[in-house]
């Protein structure tokens, strides 16, 4: 999903240097540690050694969007899927993605973390 989001940002949002901070420095991190972008939408960069407590691991709830393909498939409003990663989609770009055709069809219960996308 993260690579699809990076490619979408490059080709549909025209963010040519869209990347993940997981790949190193430089570019525009569309994907990153939550601690890098969660302060009022502004980029905050900690050190690479400052990773304690940043991994989401195990089953996580995802609220499914009404009339989405994933909701039709699962036939449920909420599902649980296994998750093991510390890098997340920067939700500050959500509106731009949606205006260009991406559907965030599964979000964390607090609506801050995309779990499922549809193109």
Please tell me what each predicted stretch does.
Residues 1-9:
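Catalytic nucleophile loop
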Residues 11-119:
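Amide-donor transfer/coupling interface in amidating biosynthetic enzymes
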């Amino acid at each position: 999903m993260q690579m699809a989001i990076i490619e979408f940002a490059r080709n549909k949002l025209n963010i040519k240097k869209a990347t993940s901070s997981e790949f190193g420095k430089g570019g525009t991190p569309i994907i990153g540690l939550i601690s890098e972008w969660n302060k009022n939408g502004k980029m905050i960069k900690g050190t690479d050694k400052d990773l304690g407590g940043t991994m989401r691991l195990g089953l996580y709830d995802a609220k499914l969007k009404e009339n989405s393909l994933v909701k039709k498939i699962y036939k449920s409003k909420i599902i649980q899927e296994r998750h093991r990663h510390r890098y997340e989609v920067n939700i500050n770009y959500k509106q731009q993605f949606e205006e260009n055709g991406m559907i965030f069809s599964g979000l964390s219960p607090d609506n801050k973390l995309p779990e499922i996308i549809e193109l």
